[in-house]
Structures are given as C-alpha cells and as structure tokens.
Amino acid sequence: MVVLVSSGSAIAGKEVLGDVNIEDASKRRQVFSAVGQPRMMRHYYSIFHDYGMRCAQVLATKRDFSPGIHRENMINCYESLLSEGIIPIANEDDAVSVTMSMFSDNDELASLVAELIKADALIILSDTDGLYTGHPEDDESEKLNKVTVDENVEKYVQESGKGEGEGRGGMESKIKIAKGTAAKNITTYIANGKRKNVILDIVAGKPVGTKFTA
C-alpha cells in the first residue's frame, strides 16, 4: 500500500494566474494554492487512470494530526481508502492553513502521515541521488548510502534558495525529517525522484539513495 505526499498546488496556481494584485504574501499563497490544487489533482488523476489505478485527494492541516477526533478521523480516512486499493495523495490544505501553524514543508507532512498509518518506510524524493559529503557535482564528493540517527551529517548540507510558490523544504529539512522518522522505527530514504524505477529499486532493497535507520 502506498500514500503519495505531493506539493505543487501553489506553483501550479501561479502558472495559471501569473502576477496578481494581492500584496499580502500569505493571501497570495492561499489564492495560488486554491487555484492550483484542482489542476494538480487533474494531472494525477490522468496519470493513475492510464495505469488502471484510482487516487484520492487528502488535504490536511496540523490540527488533523493532534490527538483527538480530528486525528481519528484522518486515520479512518486513510484506512478506508487503502482498504479499497485507492492511492491517497496528501497535501497541506494551503488555502485554509494558518501561517503560524503550517507544516515546515511537505516532508514534515509525509513524516506525520507515515507515523499515522504505521508505514514500513518513508521515501523522500529530491533532485539529487541522496546525501553527499559535499556538492553532488564535485568529483571529491561521495554519496552516503546509509546514515544512523546519531550521525552528524548536517555538516554536509549546502544552502539553496527557493522562489515564491516553490516548495519550502531543502536538504537540511529532509535530513531532520529523515532522522526524526527513522527514530520512530520507520526506515527512511532520501533519493532522486528523477531516477527511473527509483521507488521499485528501493523496495527491492537495491542501494539507491541514502537510507536512514535508528
């Protein structure tokens, strides 16, 4: 059983609307996300439909993961979808999320979902083949195949900037989330989402990406 956590609604909405007259950045994000979410889901629906698969949209805020009725309702939702063979596609409900209580990024959301459904593994897809000891393009840089939660690998992180509408997470965030999730006995991987068959290779136990364990 698989759950896909995907961002992209804000940038999808920005591509549709272009420049808007809304000065407040938070309100712009809400508008971009509200416009872009159905566009993104239409794209996913078409892809899954081509393979004879069904998918569903599951939007969440941090409140949904707090102990209580909201969390129980979220668990019921995921369990029901998965029992029917439907692939849940999770994303933060950016249109209604309060800025001060937003997820740091979708990596955090993915970690919370993994814990919620008691996942066997969490695969975080990036644009690099995993965590390196330096810049991935440097000849002297080496990929770390396996990392434990007590290793100081944060020192290898390179800074990177992101524009408006793009995802909030970088490698530093991914390491933090990967370690935190692995500490809960959920094996976590950071791998290249552009690599062919990357998920299948990880599931098959091939040395793909960087594996985080407790």
Language-model segments: residues:
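C-terminal catalytic "cap/lid" subdomain
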Residues: 1-214
